UniProtKB/Swiss-Prot annotation:
Family listed: Belongs to the major facilitator superfamily. DHA1 family. Polyamines/proton antiporter (TC 2.A.1.2.16) subfamily.
Lineage, uppermost ranks: Eukaryota, Fungi, Dikarya, Ascomycota, Pezizomycotina
InterPro entries listed in its UniProt record: MFS (IPR011701), MFS_dom (IPR020846), MFS_trans_sf (IPR036259)
Region described as Disordered: 1-32
Name of this chain's protein: MFS-rype transporter paaT
Gene this protein is translated from: paaT
A GO cellular component annotation in the UniProt record: peroxisomal membrane
GO MF assignments: transmembrane transporter activity
Amino acid sequence: MEAPRSDQAHTDATTPMEAIRTTSLGTNNYGPVPDDYLDLPVREVNDGADLREYITETRTGEIIKPIKSNVTGKTEDWKMVTFTIDDPENPKNWSKAFKWYCTMVVAFTCFVVAFCSSVITADVEGPIEEFGIGREASLVVITVFVIGFGLGPMVFAPMSEIVGRRPVYALTLALAVIFVIPCAVSKNIGTLIVCRLIDGIAFSAPMTLVGGTLADLWKSEERGVPMAAFSAAPFIGPAIGPLVGGYLADNCGWRWLYWIQLILAFVAWVMITFTVPETFAPILLKKRAQKLRKAEDDPKYTTETELDARPMGEKLRIFLFRPFQLLFLEPIVLFISLYMSVIYGLLYMFFVAYPIVYMGGKGWSASNTGLMFIPLAIGVIFSACCAPFVNNHYLKVSVAYGGKPPAEKRLIPMMWACWCIPSGLFVFAWTSYPDLHWMGPAMGGFLIGVGVILLYNSANNYLVDTYQHQAASALAAKTFIRSIWGACTVLFTEQMYERLGDQWASTLLAFIGLACCAIPYVFYFKGESIRRFSKFAFSDDEEKAIKA
């Protein structure tokens, strides 16, 4: 059948227009706001699909849609299944307490994943001594895990749109739990490397899906605080990992760095598998349509994803290749991704730099060195607490632009937070002499913690607002290049500090961070012009088509 035009859809005659309301909008124009594209099956349907089905509630639970049959040539009315008004099965209508519980479970899961990525940095020497390997081989164990972070989303993001979020959470976390065990009992470095790669791929799923899960649960005007809670988790985890790992390494040995991962990952798997229901609206409505077809003996009950007749190969091409198209053809995606890669790489460099400064320079133990990550974590928490205020400021800007602010307004937090990174690095660099007080480098970490969350959130929001219907692919591109670079930095950080010295190595990073400060300013002033010539950026013409 032909792809229906969005202006062909109309409501059931028994359902007056005023009986329809959007579940994630405060208006009656039936068009999704940018954040909603994380909650819509954009890559699962063709460009002519009508997305109202997923963002409206109707009195009868259906929207009548006329579609011309490719077989008979006649126009037939199909019943597009929707949620009913105040539908208890709509995740956005769940009680606020339960939505917060689900939010904290997925945020805790992200914390565990981030914790697992960094906890082993507390004792790189353990496997070296036991297996008789070089230091670079031991660092590869960290690297392959982060590489997995970049590879996994290419598979798990499309999988979640096809089968739902809950099965992907359950399957991948179970896989991650299983492959932590061989790490803890490994007899050689090969086992560690292979199993850590598998764990990295498996653990990437929660990081990939949580943004969509929160979009499933919360209306756009409610997402500010939940998103702040989530955004802090992936950065607090890496800060807490070396702290806990240091004490375990000093008192229990390096294998306990994996046993603690097993314990936390198992708890996260149990909580998210058995207490958090499916939240993805297209899957929920698809199951409802299947039940209605059977109960009513009427094949006309359907959903947009079921109407899409494109072969799976074409969908996979979009899933797998579109992120790279955006990365190499879109300057906005490329430079924002490079900037976030610098920030992410810096975070993993710190896992190596802190032991160099505190253990090598000051002669501290691993456990005491881990304490120096606390200011970094405090900076992250402080920044996350600022997120609601940043969101309120953006809402005021949005009102000033009649509800349609340019995407570049998302860069305002980045334009001042970007200076925190080089400032923190300069402080870290020139207070890292062995005879100076330990507080200096720690305060540098605090400044970096403050900047990193605001940069991360601002970058994500800018990409989502700029590409909207391509948002998932843009974020996947950013995640891929960010993870690959973060993995590489671990391998050369020690050599860089050895050859340049502690102060000048950190200063080099500070100058790189300083150069990156130009990126948000360039896009703030020139981004609109760049978007005008973009093949993929969202345009007003597309918005009018959606709202028609």
